Amino acid sequence: NSGSGLSRIQKVWLSFVLSAILVSNSICWSYFESMSNKKHKSFTLLGMFRRAVISWSKLMTASVGMIIKRYDLKEGVLLLDDTDKSRSKNVKKLHAAHKVKDKATGGYSIAQNIMFLVLVTDKVTIPLGFAFYEPDAEWLLWRKEDKKLKKAGIPKKDRPKEPAKSTENKREIAVGLVEKFHESFPDFKVRSICADCYFGNKAFSDGVHEVYDKVQIISQIRGNQIVYIKGKPVSVSVLFERYAGIPEIINCRGRSKNVIMYGMRIKVKSYGHKLFVIALKYEGEDEYRYITATDLSWRAIDIVS
């Protein structure tokens, strides 16, 4: 769009801000002012950010498109993940800051949860997009109260009805990020989409397959999930206890890793159809993790590499 170009001042401002972010690994206008020896005032930098009519989403898409073209990228793997960025407990104005469980201490902290999509190719790895996840406060209160009433033995018909959610859940956000990439680059070949255990479910798988019909989706399931072997239900962990794992060497982030693995194509109850399920543990680990893949034609070694 020829009418969406940046002005000279906007280009200078953007160049300085991006350089400051890379050097400081933060976004702090006061710190940027100090870096420029107070040549650029923090309120001036912030003012440009607030007043400039810049389509940030299009700028991100254009940047990705430029890298894809410059490196002649034709195919790659999409990675989905999320991270909690801890904030001060007194924060009030940061978007989507909410209470989260702190895995390190077992307590709670205030954080922003950021969902992000990354493209991994044979040449480069680049970020494609991100979105903030924010839980629905009203729905969380309902769930808390509903659990109390359920524990007290009150039947469902006598408990308050579940309210409609006003925010997207993580699975909807993740599918939205994938869909946006497909809309921007429809001819780019996606070999597979990888996501962690949180996205190991039918809702996420079906949502992605509406965007990329036959793409391989690699994720994880919990050890207590039910699968069927010869028509009989059994938990994943119990099933794989019956089989001795096979030692293999796989490529993990460019390095060779010794692993113990065993895979089989079995029906997973929560999905309603067969998946390639692979029990995998790295050298030094005691417990298996259970990797899943939707495309049954792949080899187990290719799925985990």
Residue ranges and their predicted role:
Residues 1-9, 13-15, 36, 63, ...:
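Single, function-defining residue in the core of a domain
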Residues 5-10, 20, 24-91, 96-97, ...:
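Electropositive nucleic-acid engagement tracts
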Residues 48-149, 258-266:
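Active-site-proximal, Lys/Arg-enriched surface segment
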